[in-house]
Amino acid sequence: MKKMFSFILLIQLLMMAACSDQNLIPKDKASKVVDTYGITAFTVTIGTKEETEALKASFIEKKERSEAEFSNNKQGVNLHGEKALKKITEAFEKLSPDPEAEETELIKKTAEAFEFKDYQMIRLEVTFKGYDSKEIMFSK
């Protein structure tokens, strides 16, 4: 019985940690990203020969809560919230996102913006304000 209680307590703690607010960003900062780049949701995963998820970055702007997450295993960087948003917007500066861009152009620019020239795979999901979501998968 004691073991069962300990197990349930451990599961609850893990669930609470997973549901933390560490990825949250202030509404004004999320709105600024949408106003500047026109992006309401962005998720990219870049894989290399060495690692299938060498880079993961995501930004999502919603009325009730906006979030950002950034992980670059090549550089040993794992950021959440405003720090992650800063890294992502630095990449957006280089990317110059365009909702009318061709898929191959988006892939190429995304790899360059996140400084991954040696990628094997890129999975990109992006939603521009007023446009349908684009989901692109590219493997070499």
Predicted regions mapped to residue ranges:
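Short, surface-exposed loop and linker segments with low hydrophobicity and enrichment for Pro/Ser/Thr
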Residues: 6-7, 29-40, 111-118
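Sec-dependent N-terminal signal peptides of Gram-positive bacterial secreted proteins and lipoproteins
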Residues: 1-24
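Short N-terminal secondary-structure initiator segments
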Residues: 17-31, 73-82
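Mature extracytoplasmic domains of secretory-pathway proteins
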Residues: 52-119
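Solvent-exposed coil/turn segments that connect beta secondary-structure elements
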Residues: 47-49, 60, 127-131, 139
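N-terminal export/targeting and maturation segments
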Residues: 21-66
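Hydrophobic transmembrane alpha-helix bundles
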Residues: 31, 81-87, 137-140
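Short, exposed beta-strand-loop hairpins at the edges of beta-sheets
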Residues: 112-136
